[in-house]
Amino acid sequence: MKKTIGILGGMGPLATCDLFHKVVEVTEAGTDQEHIRVCVDSNTEIPDRTAAILSGGADPVPEMVRSALRLECMGADVLIMPCNTAHYFYDQVTRFVRT
C-alpha cells in the first residue's frame, strides 16, 4: 500500500504549489492511479514565522499543529513543509502529531 503525503502549506502558497508540482513531476507513473496520493492544507492563517522568531510576533505553532492534525485526519502518513523558516518550529510541532 502506498503512503499518503501531507503538505503543510500556506507559508508561501506558491512554495506549496511548487512542491506539489515537483512531487508529481518526479513520480514515475504511467497512469493517474499510479501517482502518490497527496493531501494539501494551504493554511494562510499561520502567523508570520520570521516575525515570531525575530520580534516576538504571534506564535505560529498552534496553527501549524492544527494543519498537521488536519492532514493526519485526511490520511497523511508523512508530512512535509515547503517553508524553510517553518522548520525553526519543527520540534514544537512534532510533539503534537504522530506522523
Each language-model region and where it sits:
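Non-catalytic structural scaffold of enzyme domains
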Residues: M1-T99
